[in-house]
């Protein structure tokens, strides 16, 4: 889709116009583990106080129905008010080791969105420059979100030990999450954890990286960006972390904003792709969600693509970034833009993001959850939607994979196909996305890429978003799955649906 960009940075709201920088504060590990349901299913979300105590017995939702808008019962802490969270050690194979900057990086100037009447209010205008030591304030002058930094599990490449002038400090390495009991049966490691860490992206941090040299190359080639291969090589073959350092070096050396200069030379899909590449990954997710809900209409598939596929640590950082940059509670926006079981699924997923994701699997709990799902669907007349919501929205991805395997043993049916028979619409798509990411995440993005290029026309925003966000995570596996499923390489599909500099950049990012 197309966005109407104001002058300067193309429509991407700048950080509130304060001068101080936003270094990550000392982080603390957030207690890890999943919610261990008590006998009878276990309530969800956590009990009063916002802690990680095992929830009491009883089903979800509570007897009085789902919680009213404004938050979960029992004192669930608000997202933005929490301290900074350290990324869980090891993550799920989502990117490079710690070293990525916080999402507050230099270069995003220009006024904020001009929201249509009746839509979202525009974020605070004004960009930000190379940050000195201090802290960015949140919208409206509130103190900055303490300790928020880009998690290692979503880092797009690791930076070197040195820092350019004006560069953001490196991320504090995440602490290993403390163990949380997973239920009555001993937790057992799962092969899924190893499979997740085996994924790889097409872009890796460039060796012998020189941010100032790259900034000079971009400045010299600015006029011929659409035809000169040098700037394409620089942008498409640097990690996200390295691109942030290039922006800082450009501003330090020339006193100009790289993004504004690029925008003056670019337009259309090339512009959208370049801006996406230069956005820090957490900010890009938050920005995409904001655009999916602002103004008239809602892009539900964007909500599904991001919220149903990200890890817990990624979700909580997206929630905090959304609040910091747009001055809005993402939960309130979701409640106002969605409804019914789809709304409850998304809200439950965000609640799951409060805790660190465990890589252990409780096999006894998986069997119990499989029985619960069978009794909620195939084993009764009608469908108990709340039971599906409880299991699929609150369990970790490794645990859900074990649930799917247990379900197949119990019913001799595939849980994905059962969801297709029991649900329809966006709730079906959302539940399937969660489960597919638990079983094999690259397959979900493979199918999304195929749909973005299927038929007449191309969904360029989806194509750009997936290629960019998965380029340092699992795009290699997505490409392999694509050719196996469709007997056509992803590069061939991109080549037949795009052209010019836009095509060359997409192919370069995808490792062609």
Swiss-Prot record:
A pair of annexin repeats may form one binding site for calcium and phospholipid. Belongs to the annexin family. Annexin repeats lie at residues 209-279, 280-351, 364-436, 440-511. GO terms for molecular function: calcium ion binding; calcium-dependent phospholipid binding; phosphatidylserine binding. Keywords: Annexin, Calcium, Calcium/phospholipid-binding, Repeat. Residues 14-62, 146-190 are annotated as: Disordered. This is Annexin A7. PANTHER family: ANNEXIN, ANNEXIN A7. GO terms for cellular component: cytoplasm; nucleus; plasma membrane; vesicle membrane. Residues 14-38, 164-182 have a biased composition (Low complexity). InterPro entries: Annexin, Annexin_repeat, Annexin_repeat_CS, Annexin_sf. The keyword Calcium applies. Residues 39-52 have a biased composition (Gly residues). It comes from Xenopus laevis. Calcium/phospholipid-binding protein which promotes membrane fusion and is involved in exocytosis.
């Amino acid at each position: 889709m197309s966005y109407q960009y104001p002058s300067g940075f193309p429509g991407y709201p700048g950080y509130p116009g304060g001068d101080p920088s936003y270094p990550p504060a000392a982080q603390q590990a957030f207690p890890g583990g999943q919610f261990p349901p008590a006998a009878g299913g276990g309530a969800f979300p956590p009990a009063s106080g916002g802690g990680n105590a095992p929830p009491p017995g009883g089903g979800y939702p509570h007897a009085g129905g789902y919680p009213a808008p404004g938050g979960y019962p029992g004192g669930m802490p608000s997202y933005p008010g929490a301290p900074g969270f350290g990324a869980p050690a090891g993550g799920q194979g989502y990117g490079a080791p710690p070293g990525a900057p916080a999402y507050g990086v230099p270069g995003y100037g220009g006024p904020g969105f001009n929201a249509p009447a009746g839509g979202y209010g525009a974020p605070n205008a004004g960009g930000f420059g190379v940050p000195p030591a201090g802290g960015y304030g949140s919208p409206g002058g509130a103190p900055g979100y303490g300790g928020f930094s880009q998690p290692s599990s979503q880092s797009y490449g690791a930076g070197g030990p040195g820092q350019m002038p004006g560069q953001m400090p490196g991320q504090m390495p995440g602490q290993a999450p403390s163990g949380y009991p997973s239920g009555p049966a001993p937790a057992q490691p799962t092969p899924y954890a190893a499979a997740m860490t085996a994924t790889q992206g097409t872009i890796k941090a460039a060796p012998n990286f020189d941010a100032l040299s790259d900034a000079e190359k971009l400045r010299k080639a600015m006029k011929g960006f659409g035809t000169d291969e040098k700037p394409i090589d620089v942008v498409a073959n640097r990690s996200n972390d390295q691109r942030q350092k290039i922006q800082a070096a450009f501003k330090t050396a020339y006193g100009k904003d790289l993004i504004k200069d690029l925008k003056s030379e670019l337009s259309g899909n090339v512009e959208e792709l370049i801006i996406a590449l230069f956005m820090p990954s957490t900010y890009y997710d938050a920005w995409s969600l904001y655009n999916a809900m602002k103004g008239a209409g809602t892009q539900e598939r964007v909500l599904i693509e991001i919220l149903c596929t990200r890890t817990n640590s990624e979700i909580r950082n997206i929630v905090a970034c959304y609040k910091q940059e747009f001055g809005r509670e993402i939960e309130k926006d979701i409640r106002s833009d969605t409804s019914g079981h789809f709304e409850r699924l998304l809200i439950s997923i965000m609640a799951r993001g409060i805790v660190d994701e465990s890589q252990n699997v409780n096999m006894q709990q998986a069997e119990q959850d499989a029985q619960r799902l069978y009794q909620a669907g195939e084993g009764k007349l009608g469908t108990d939607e709340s039971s599906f919501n409880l299991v699929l929205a609150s369990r970790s991805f490794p645990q859900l994979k074990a649930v799917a395997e247990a379900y197949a043993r119990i019913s001799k049916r595939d849980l994905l196909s059962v969801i297709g028979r029991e649900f329809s619409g966006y709730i079906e798509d959302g539940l399937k996305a969660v489960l597919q990411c638990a079983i094999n995440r690259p397959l979900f993005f493979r199918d999304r890429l195929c749909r973005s290029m299927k038929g007449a026309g191309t969904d360029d925003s989806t194509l750009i978003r997936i290629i960019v966000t998965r380029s340092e995570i699992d795009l290699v596996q997505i490409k392999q799955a694509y050719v196996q499923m469709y007997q056509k390489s992803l590069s061939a599909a991109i080549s037949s649906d795009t052209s010019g500099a836009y095509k060359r950049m997409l192919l370069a990012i995808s490792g062609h």
